[in-house]
A protein has these predicted regions:
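A short beta-loop-alpha structural element at the N-terminal edge
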Residues: 1-17
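Helix-loop element at the rim of GNAT/NAT acetyltransferase active sites that forms part
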Residues: 16-32
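Active-site rim helix/loop that mediates acceptor-substrate recognition in acyltransferases
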Residues: 28-53
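Conserved acetyl-CoA-binding loop-helix of GNAT-fold acetyltransferases
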Residues: 89, 95-108, 132
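Conserved GNAT acetyl-CoA-binding A-motif
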Residues: 103, 110-122
């Protein structure tokens, strides 16, 4: 059975393992424990970001990190927009619709909070996924992350 729930003390260790796998897959050499303990968890506790973790039976299979861009947040690229910051599904669970399920969950929670539009800064490998979910490539570019901006103007628009 699939279950998506907000990150909690009970799932912190599983999230750390998933995030570590995600960063290794991206080829990042950052200190993952430092990132989680000094940036991610404090931002979560301050209400600046949201994290949902996906469980498939006994397996923790992925997560999504998202936020509403706000002037009070250190990362405020598009004021008032939803930002799908990170989305990860473990390799053994890919191509089963779980990424779309996580993305749709984040979008609906953003919509419930009054956000009507979202964007993402996908890697080249994930661009097709976001396009299939209704995001459109823009002329926007984020130099810090070396990424093209993709936008979705209707969060009622489900993934294909």
């Amino acid at each position: 059975m699939l279950k998506i729930s907000p990150l909690s003390d009970l799932t912190k260790n599983e999230f750390e393992a998933l995030f570590s796998s995600y960063y290794q897959e991206l080829g990042c050499e950052d200190d993952i424990a430092h990132l989680i303990n000094e940036y991610i968890l404090p931002d979560l506790l301050a209400g600046l970001i949201n994290i949902e973790i996906l469980q498939d039976g006994d397996t923790y299979a992925g997560f999504v990190i998202y936020q509403t861009d706000d002037i009070n947040n250190e990362w405020n690229f598009k004021e008032g927009w939803g930002d799908i910051r990170e989305l990860y599904i473990i390799p053994s669970h890919r191509r089963q619709g779980l990424g779309k399920f996580l993305l749709y969950t984040a979008e609906m929670k953003l919509k419930e909070s009054g956000v009507n539009k979202s964007y993402c800064l996908p890697s080249e490998e994930s661009e097709k996924f976001f396009i299939a979910c209704g995001y459109e490539r823009t002329e926007g570019y984020n130099a810090e992350l070396d990424s093209i901006v993709y936008e979705k103007h209707d969060l009622s628009n489900k993934c294909k």
